[in-house]
Amino acid sequence: MVFGVHPVEEVIKAGKELEKVFVQSGLRSQQISEIVKYAKNHEVPVQFVPIEKLNRLTRKNHQGIVAFVCPISYQTIENVVPMVYDEGRMPFVVILDRVTDVRNFGAIARTCYAAGVDAIVIPSRGSALINGDAMKTSAGALSLINVCRVENIKDTIDFLKASGLKVIAFSEKGKQTIWQADLTGPIAIMMGSEEDGISEAYLKRVDDHLVIPMPGDIDSLNVSVATGIVTFEVVRQRLG
């Protein structure tokens, strides 16, 4: 927790992720307006609350603003992939396209860590916040696995392909089943949002587009469940 105008500004300048911001109702200043604008532009929840609420959060001089900071440090995918190769291993990356539900995100992180995934890639905007709910659902995995927040997913796909990874999208529109594909090499799997699936722009860039066969009447799965199936199929194939 960070309180006071200048400390919150410094946290933002340092590139730290804000989880949520509380602002005293009726308080107006240019500095606070800039912080609120930044928060809203980055889809950080802002609540205007009575001063009594802020006083309960901290007894110190909060100047009408209290911010909660994301509990993890983001990594860069450009550093993670070479590091994995240097260790003599084949990179295993999961890309999430606009997965916004924090509990789904936490469950995915827990599954990915258990499956030995080297990094989870998320967009800088339109992704779930790494907050207390996400951390709890992940059973602590979010503090252990590499999470890479990127400005441009297209550029990341291109980087991964240039680095020797096969980038594979998974959705109900895939042309080949997961069981028919070779997932043993360096790989990045892409999973789509709960509402819209994977963006068409990304589907045009990937190496392959696969489907999890479902003989039942329901033709889609929760994204965290689907990610679990896919990641552990990679594990199964790699273990032989």
Where on the chain are the PLM-derived regions?
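Active-site/ligand-binding-proximal alpha/beta "capping" segment
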Residues: 168-222
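Structured adenosyl-cofactor binding patch, chiefly the S-adenosyl-L-methionine
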Residues: 9, 14-15, 19, 114, ...
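N-terminal positively charged helical leader segments and presequences
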Residues: 1-83
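General small-molecule cofactor/ligand-binding pocket signal
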Residues: 22, 45-49, 148, 163, ...
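Short, acidic/turn-prone active-site loops that include or flank metal/cofactor-
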Residues: 26-27, 51-52, 125-127, 194-196, ...
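Short hydrophobic alpha-helical runs that function as membrane-insertion/retention elements
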Residues: 47, 119-123, 211
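Surface-exposed amphipathic alpha-helices with a cationic face
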Residues: 40, 157-161, 235
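RNA substrate-binding interface of SAM-dependent RNA methyltransferases
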Residues: 10-17, 82-176
